[in-house]
Amino acid sequence: MNVKQPTDDELRFIAAEYHLDLSDDDLASFQGLITGSLAAYERLHELTEPKPEVKYPRTPGYRPEPADNPLNAWYYRTSIKGAASGPLAGKTVVIKDNVCVAGVPMMNGTSALEGYVPDTDATVVTRILDAGGEIVGKAECESLCFSGGSHTNENGPIRNPYNPAHTTGGSSAGSAALVAAGEVDMAIGGDQGGSIRIPSCWCGTYGLKPTHGLVPYTGAFPIEITIDHLGPITATTADCALLLEVIAGKDGLDPRQYDVKTEAYTQALSGDISDLRIGIVEEGFGWANSEADVDASVRAAADQFAALGATVGAVSIPMHLDGQAIWTGIATEGATMLMVKGNSMGHGYVNGDRIP
């Protein structure tokens, strides 16, 4: 039997922990209930787990030599060609190494996972291939994606293509670096607290953290379900909208997705923006660790929207000042439950091999 029937002594021990005193009749009653439940669990154990089809042939690829990987941005290189036609036909795409690509090694920046090879594709991977894109490899990321720098990866720091002595930002460090260097057209990144946006800013690419739940996270290594996001990193806004159009929408598998509404994002790239209102958060500027020229650059970029006809104005969100503290609590507690106790599988996960 997959799960063994508890003994009466074990039931008494559990009951005592809850300050319950069970009679022999109580124990017999509970044992009867448990027997019926265990039969159901035994049947569940016998059922074959359905797995999404791996639709496109591929090889595991290879780990590039340092001479061919000067930014240390590639984890693995491969070539997985998708459909013969589609909106991404002719586009090369690299996938952040916290996202599963069947048959291709994945370590999520840490030696703890080195040697792991997924046997299914993440939903975003399947959608990219169905749209005609070619996946050309996995991009290095920070250790378990828990850094906004580019220095915690087990294989060494990921270097900025504009100045190798500078950080790329993280945790989607390799994704942004490879796009900025022109080695790929597009990348998939992940974002829990800036991990698409930070490296995109520091590498001069376009990165978008989509609305929560818009893009399915199915098949990606999580941190906490309320802050997990996958999104595009590209060299142009047009490609950013195009990739988002391909990967957005429900997949019926991701509990992060609820009332998902997709749009034709590429059609929103031109036209009148006079009805667009943009708020500049006052509390986002002037921090002790802020740089004045960066603050000025952000405000200048906002002014460009005003010049194009949008309404741009200051807004105050005082709680923004506590955002990092709030995020730290959510991410730490969530990661403990989901990544550590849940083995990245979810709350209440139990490894069947450990059940006596």
Regions inferred by a protein language model and the residue ranges of each:
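Generic structural signal for helix capping and beta-alpha/helix-loop junctions
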Residues: 143-145, 195-196, 288, 322
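Fold-level recognition of mixed alpha/beta catalytic cores in primary-metabolism enzymes, strongest
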Residues: 39, 43, 149, 155-157, ...
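Amidase signature
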Residues: 1-88, 246-356
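Amphipathic alpha-helical segments in well-structured domains
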Residues: 121, 205, 295-299
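Gly/Ser-rich catalytic/binding loops embedded in alpha/beta enzyme cores
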Residues: 21-192, 303
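Short, basic, helix/turn surface patches
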Residues: 159-173, 213-220, 336-351
